[in-house]
C-alpha cells in the first residue's frame, strides 16, 4: 500500500493520500450511520491499489480498456494478494467507479459511500490545484473569487 505514494492520482495528490482521505471520510460517515465502517475503511484504503501511472501506461501495459474501466479489477486482484476480503470490501473495490462504470451498480450502502467519497476527494484535489495555481497571482485571485461568487450565486 505504501508504494501508492509513488503514483500521482489527481493533480498534485498521490494515490496513497487520496485513498487515506477516502478511507477516513468513509469510516467517519459509516460509523455515524451504523454501517460496517471497518470494511469501508479497509476497502477505502485499497480501492485504487493499481500501482502504475495511469496517465501514460495504456500502451506500455497493453491495457485493452481505459483506466477508469479497468483499474477496479486490477485493484481487487492486488488487494486480494495482500489480504482476505469480505464481500462488502470486494463490492466496494469493484464498483467504486460507478456511475462511470454504469453497469457495475453498487450492492451495499458502504459501496455508495465510498463512491461518493471518491468523487468528493477528486473534486477537493481539483479545487486545491486550482486554488494553488490560480490564487497565487493577484489578478487571478480576484477572478477566482468572482468565479466562486458566480457558482454559489453570491453576487
What is the predicted role of each segment?
Residues 1-155:
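Metal-dependent phosphohydrolase cores
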